[in-house]
């Protein structure tokens, strides 16, 4: 039902898009979206490190950071953590983490985050170390201080509604100006794995506002690309920097969407005969895997359809590994051996073709994206200087 509704929304977006005007490069809206997936966040971290390295090379600037080039960076679960790491400012008002720092972060802290709590009835992990390290790294920083627009999702189990943390929402909903560590823990608090997170903020009149949040994947089913595009669309309508964008047009969007890998095409498939013998617990685990795999595929399908309909397929790049096997399929296997395998998955993915119909590799496509991002940044800087 939810996927049908999403498709209809996008279908009417296409119908509403009548302008054939191509945006000037400096006025294109650039969007980065990062999926959820626990320790598998190592895979998009490898991709981000490569892209940031390319931007530094193209611009001959070792201090170039991803937040300098993207108008919107969105993520859910581990993707929300990556979003915070590359957009939260340090004391010099620069991202506190470079992309190359993310994989070492997983290696240092992953084994402690995914350390079995020993509880039979509660979540698999108590979440204490995760919250502690997020507090240490992100400090008291709040959403409004992010270096670019962010879109981090969570789900409130008390109101039964998604909660989207963005800078652009704060004027209307100041209670969303939460601390980044609270947001990061909340978006990563996957049911079964971590406890839900409770915290409070304040409304414009000073009243206490309560949150009871779980994993953002409950709201976006693991892939926040549609959410990130929605935030980018609103940004384009409200920000004077994008004055040439008169109506929704995906020719005017540049979207990079990073997955954390799936195994839907190669592993953990089932027959009707097998599934007929399952009990509730086995079905619960299988449904989670199936839902994540189906959602990732359908979101990519929807977005690809929209960009192709606007003859803008080169403006969208989905980087995803669909052949995970063995321990690399697990979101919580933080053993050193498995993390090394995930690094290899990311590095190998860069050499793979983007599609069966194109010889272009992900590495080549990311270099093309880096050049576009660099050119747009320079054009925008020149325009601002007049």
UniProtKB/Swiss-Prot annotation:
The root-end lineage is: Eukaryota, Viridiplantae, Streptophyta, Embryophyta, Tracheophyta
Q: Which InterPro entries match?
A: Acyl_Trfase/lysoPLipase (IPR016035), PNPLA_dom (IPR002641)
Query: Which parts of the sequence form the motif GXSXG?
Result: 75-79
Q: Which domain of life is it from?
A: Eukaryota
The protein's name: Patatin-15
Residues listed as glycosylation sites in the UniProt record:
115
GO molecular function terms noted in the UniProt entry: monoacylglycerol lipase activity; nutrient reservoir activity; phospholipase activity
Cellular component GO terms held in the UniProt record: vacuole
